[in-house]
Amino acid sequence: MKKKSLNAKKKIHKKLLNYLKNPLISKIFRDFENFLLNCNDAKSFAVAVSGGPDSLALTYLSKCFSILNDVNVKYYHVDHKLRNESTEEAKKIELLLKSFDINCKTIVWKGQKPKSNIQSVSRNKRYSLIIKQITKENISHILVAHQLDDLYENFLIRLFRGSGLKGLSSFSRSNSGSSKGVIILRPLIKYNKKDLLYITNKIFNYYINDPSNSNENFKRTRVRKLINNLKQEGLDENKLKLTISNLSDSNSAIEHFVRENINLNSSYSKSNLTYIIRANFFAQPHEVIFRSLSNILKKVGKKYYSSRGKSLNQMIKRIKSKKFNKATISGCIIEKISNSLIIYKENRKKC
């Protein structure tokens, strides 16, 4: 690198780090830094940059982290093409971040776009596109900018859907989000949106304002409004946080027995990508069986999300019947051999 370019980079880095003298920014960054440093197996990170205030605050904090800890951090923005201005916004984000010595790669969503359930489908597509890209680059951890308001909204949306314990408590600070082994990290989940907005305005003085965030045709917008109304009835944020924390503790206990069930009552062959399930696997409480089988199907079928609960419950019922022989679910084949089951990917020859 030329001396002139190196000096310019140092000036930019010094300017970015100077903002850490701000008490609020410093407090959030120290917690952010400690969280990432405790991800012992992470050698590099990817950051999902939507261009909104939350993600730009995340971008700034992760850039400071990379400077101070000499850690490789890469940044990705998805041009979803759902709005006419999305490509222009992507260019603005690239140029803005470049002026702060942050190289942001834009991934274009090509192909057919959803006509219904737009927000959910789009969110899942953004995840899958970025995860596909970072897997090629051997990056195993992705940072996303979910914050405290997102936690509450997600909890209520899943409650309205009738989600079980896992669904209601799965929006944690760290969780496996992909069959490809990518870990999703939410380092800002403890913080309010107003704090992140403060950081973004202080550093960048710019962010993309997504009009869908105020469109009441979308459930998330209506839920956001509902939360404000519920405060008047006594369900404030502290009570929501306590409820989610209690559910999360209960969920962790069940996950312990799920891991134990998989370890003791199944075996995995890496050479032919096959699970062998022993009879005692299905002698556990239903929730443990359900989650254990779901995890195995995700791994074998290389699926981002688990099977629908109804489909999986029906499959468990079939497997337990004496007449069960063979079935297909989530891109996997489940076949009974003597008192055991083998599970392997569909359209693949058994070894």
Describe each model-derived feature in a short phrase:
Residues 1-54, 72-76, 80, 109-114, ...:
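AMP-forming adenylation/ATP pyrophosphatase catalytic core
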Residues 2-226:
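Core alpha/beta nucleotide-donor-binding catalytic domains of modification enzymes
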Residues 236:
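Catalytic-core segments of class I nucleotidyltransferases/pyrophosphorylases
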